[in-house]
Structures are given as C-alpha cells and as structure tokens.
UniProtKB/Swiss-Prot annotation:
GO biological process: dendrite extension; memory; positive regulation of DNA-templated transcription
Record lineage: Eukaryota, Metazoa, Spiralia, Lophotrochozoa, Mollusca
Molecular function as annotated in GO: basal RNA polymerase II transcription machinery binding; DNA binding; nucleic acid binding; RNA binding
Protein's UniProt name: Protein LLP
Organism: Aplysia kurodai (Kuroda's sea hare)
Localisation: Nucleus, Nucleolus
Major place of residence: nucleus
Compositionally biased tracts (Basic residues): 97-120
InterPro entries linked to this entry: LLPH-like
Annotated family: Belongs to the learning-associated protein family.
GO CC annotation terms, alphabetical: nucleolus; protein-DNA complex
PANTHER family found in the cross-reference section: PROTEIN LLP HOMOLOG
Length: 120
C-alpha cells in the first residue's frame, strides 16, 4: 500500500516528540545518578553477622507453637435454588446464570402452587 501524507506526518511528529523527550529523559537520568552517588548506603543498611543471629533468641518459635486461627465454616448451598442461607448465589456464578436459576426456581414454585390448588 502507498504511504499517505497523514502517516508520513504522524511519523515525523513522533520523531520530533521522541527527540524532545530524550532531552528530558537524559536530564532525569543524570539527576538520579548524582543522587545515587550522594546517598550513603552504610547509614541505610545494617548488616548482622551469623553469630549475632544465632545468639539472639527467636520469638517466632513461640508463635509457631500457638498455631494460626482459621475459620473453617463452609458455605452451604441448597441444591435446588443454589443459594446459601443468606440468599446469595455462589461467587463463581455469573449474572446470566443467576437470572436463569431464578426463572427456574420461580417455575418450580408456581408448579407447586398449582398442584396444591387442584386437589379436591
């Protein structure tokens, strides 16, 4: 395909933009490099020797003995309606499936009501 004037102009403008931001980027990188040299890493990080770590009593061992409190309550869903006790549908069920299920449950309810009324 032939190159349009529009695409040529866009390419030209992208190049101008690239040059413009290259200057700003270079300045920013220079500033970051100068700040990195000024920063003294000795004040930021404190190293501990292996002996200090071994001699220090560990508090995490007492936490491991206690164990973790876990809530093991399972969500129970009714098979017919697929709702839990609160009337919510499962999290994995999308809205389209929820609407379909509601229609199905409504049909079951109307069939039950009709069946009860006909008894003589």
């Amino acid at each position: 395909m032939a190159k349009s004037i529009r695409s040529k102009h866009r390419r030209q403008m992208r190049n101008v933009k690239r040059e413009h931001f290259a200057k700003k980027d270079l300045d920013r990188l220079k500033r970051l490099a100068s700040k990195a040299q000024e920063l003294d890493l000795d004040n930021v990080v404190t190293m501990k020797s292996a002996e200090e770590i071994k001699n220090k009593p560990s508090t995490s061992a007492s936490d491991a003995d206690k164990g973790m409190e876990v809530d093991n309550t399972k969500k129970v869903f009714k098979k017919k309606t697929q709702q839990n006790e609160d009337g919510h549908y499962p999290q994995w069920m999308n809205q389209r499936a929820v609407k379909k299920q509601k229609v199905k449950v409504a049909k079951l309810k109307t069939k039950k009501k009709i069946g009860k009324k006909i008894k003589w």
